[in-house]
Amino acid sequence: MSLSRESAMNIANVLTEALPYIQRFTGKTVVVKFGGNAMEGEALQNSFARDIVLMKLVGMNPVVVHGGGPQIGSLLEKLNIKSEFINGMRVTDSATMDVVEMVLGGTVNKQIVSLINRNGGQAIGLTGKDGQLIRAKKLTVTHKTPEMLAPEILDIGHVGEVQSVNTAVIDMLINSDFIPVIAPIGVGEDGASYNINADLVAGKIAEFLRAEKLMLLTNVSGLQDKQGNVLTGLSTEQVDALIADGTIYGGMLPKIACALDAVKGGVTSAHIIDGRVDHAVLLEIFTDAGVGTLITNKPKA
């Protein structure tokens, strides 16, 4: 069955619109944080995997970093291990860390690897412990109430922050035409494992790789102003101002701060995109309009 003239022209227009972007980004590295609603449902999962495979086929170097908070919570519940959060971070004792490693480094990581491979890619899964990819240190959290004379330092267990990234491991995989899929688990100097926020890991990997783009898939349509309008293009100075005036607050603040730090650290652009949209990654990279918020270091975005 042949296409109608209108359908054929629509396909041709899409391809020609994508061409300059393909030419511009060939050979460039793009770090994509996969999580949230984008991980739920077979259709969105396959949409994401095909986007990643197509990026590789047209000469880009996608690097996937994934989360897995709901899956961790589900297994902890089955094992009757209590989940506790402080400042949005999971308190991670030794028993919880074992579960985190099983879920992130085992189940979720291999599911994503399999998903990409089934859609025609060549993915290899690893955690930050492999090849000492992610060197981490213990994250300390402070807590203060008006009644306290000095802030209290809280121990939240095996929760870490990125100290350094061994980019040679990632470069080796990229140069061998593999797609790295990375679980956000770091390793300390003493060999201890650390649970690290996946957005922060993605941002730091993008920074150390000097990536062209950092893309964070979220459950919202992008960064919004106080009237609920999506802000499609922002400079780092504009983002700083939106944080200062309270437009960016709450749960969105850590994600935006991660994107902001990456761009200030040398990543060309960061993108907050709606993971609930089919082929959101391709639409953001290869179309003029995009489907989210672009943050750059340019005076005007």
From Swiss-Prot:
Annotated EC: 2.7.2.8
Keywords, sorted A to Z: Amino-acid biosynthesis, Arginine biosynthesis, ATP-binding, Cytoplasm, Kinase, Nucleotide-binding, Transferase
Catalytic activity from the UniProt record: N-acetyl-L-glutamate + ATP = N-acetyl-L-glutamyl 5-phosphate + ADP
UniProt site (Transition state stabilizer): K33, K255
GO terms (BP aspect): arginine biosynthetic process via ornithine; L-arginine biosynthetic process
Signal peptide region: none
Matches recorded under CDD domains: AAK_NAGK-C (cd04250)
GO CC, one annotated term: cytoplasm
UniProt GO MF annotations: acetylglutamate kinase activity; ATP binding
Subcellular location(s) per record: Cytoplasm
The protein's annotated pathway: Amino-acid biosynthesis; L-arginine biosynthesis; N(2)-acetyl-L-ornithine from L-glutamate: step 2/4
Binding site for substrate: G68, G69, R90, N195
Alphabetized Pfam families for the sequence: AA_kinase
Function per UniProt: Catalyzes the ATP-dependent phosphorylation of N-acetyl-L-glutamate.
The family this protein is said to belong to: Belongs to the acetylglutamate kinase family. ArgB subfamily.
HAMAP family, alphabetized: ArgB
Protein's UniProt name: Acetylglutamate kinase
Organism field: Cellvibrio japonicus (strain Ueda107)
Biological classification of the source: Bacteria, Pseudomonadati, Pseudomonadota, Gammaproteobacteria, Cellvibrionales
Gene that this sequence comes from: argB
